[in-house]
């Protein structure tokens, strides 16, 4: 039977590290923890689970720290997690059964990073369990990843990201600015640097850098589509609604229409009181297939609740109260929000 080395990097994670390690202790064979400078009780907690704790002097490079952890691994496969990740019981049971049959080079698991009443609302696949050979290397100082290699299998189980505190919100941008002084960013770095600018509300800088990204070769399709979506959001915020719409339509050059893009196009028409057009685009969102198997980011709300609410409101203004009520009820089947209840009460007056 193949064995698995868990490789982690941590810093000041006393609030979450025990929760994480409790969720993996029954299926991993070795726990390696690299500490990048904790001043709390993280190490004391980790010692309950392993004596393989190593110090690493932080150098503004997540990949170097993670690769150092991998270098200490003894077994055929490595698994990596963040301290605020949790392996659900269902996934634990699945991996215990899988271990005797590990043969692939790379196993991808879903990563749930946002929740509504414990139901995942934002998910995507990450490379999670990998053969421990010279291909198993993280790249990227920030937003680091291992490029999936060899035979790859996607597993229909998930890791949950359960953050309990926010970290240094300026750290990633600071690291990217440091890299930019030393060399030109590659396409992946350019994408994530632009996202950091957006998150810091530097919208004009974000636009400039995303437009630069559009001219770069070797941009991953998912990053290219999302970069156009972010460009659209920037122009929306900057008050240029027509450019915002243009960038949404440009995403269609790279793949079939995504649910979130269809909803945003529908929002444009709804805001402009063009309700037949908004109906069309909200319906397209409900027909869209999720893109998680392509490596895309899936925001579940755009596949059902959000377009159902949009259809409810659009049909209301078209005076088709039967259809308005129908889609409000469909939205209510997903979640009974304040908006659903208000619509229900309002529509009762028009359904008499």
Task: Describe every region a protein language model picked out.
Residues 15-18, 40-49, 90-91:
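Acidic helix N-cap motif at the loop->helix transition within catalytic regions
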Residues 2-5, 30:
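Cell-envelope/extracellular polymer assembly enzymes that use nucleotide-activated donors
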Residues 7-27:
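Short, well-formed alpha-helical segments that are part of the catalytic scaffolds
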Residues 44-68, 72:
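Conserved donor nucleotide-binding strand/loop of the catalytic core
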Residues 23, 35-45, 58, 82, ...:
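A conserved acidic beta->alpha catalytic loop
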Residues 2, 63-70, 87-212, 218:
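Catalytic-site signature of metal-activated, phosphate-bearing donor transferases
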Residues 78:
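Short aromatic/hydrophobic "clamp" motif used to bind/position activated sugar donors
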